[in-house]
Amino acid sequence: ESAILSTKIIKLIGKTNPSGFAYELFLDEKGEKISKSKGNGITIDQWLEYASPESLSLYMYQNPKRAKKLYKQIVPKAVDEYLDCIEKAKSQKELQLLMNPVWHVHNSKVPKENMIMSFSMLLNLVETSNADSRELLWKFIKKYKSNISEKEHPIFDKLVGYAIKYFKDVIK
């Protein structure tokens, strides 16, 4: 209410209104405010068990003034959006690249790594293969693309671990 009243006073004296501070809310999948006591939603620490800090940064970067739904099932979509932004960055010219959120998330050092598959597809592979270890999942991945290695694809290698953990905790 203070901000509303201040805005009216500023307008009356003919001055420019200061920008108001937007308080960002985090919502669960039903659109209700996340609460520790209810245990709804996902914590930042939980997100970081299932996905990279960069995917969370991108998720937070988009629409900064809008309340965000923060629950476990949103993680795969957010990771896929992050991977898509990395892929798009490879072919973007300077001005387009500046508009790409991963340029900011990575402080202008966008990864050059080629993405092998989406996180959603990786989760499907975990489910259909019933892989419960990185080594086993990498064997299936190498059947899909034989000329790759964990060392050449460090981002994807981390995704492999995240996918197994996410599948065990959320999907299974």
Where are these regions (language model features)?
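Divalent-metal (Mg2+/Mn2+/Ca2+)-assisted nucleotide/phosphate chemistry catalytic cores
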Residues: E1-T7, K11-G14
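Catalytic adenosine-cofactor/nucleotide-binding cores of aminoacyl-tRNA synthetases and other
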Residues: A3, Y23-F167
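Short, well-ordered coil loops that connect the C-terminus of an alpha-helix to the N-terminus
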Residues: K15-T16, P53
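C-terminal low-complexity, glycine/proline- and small-hydrophobic-enriched intrinsically disordered tails
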Residues: V170-K172
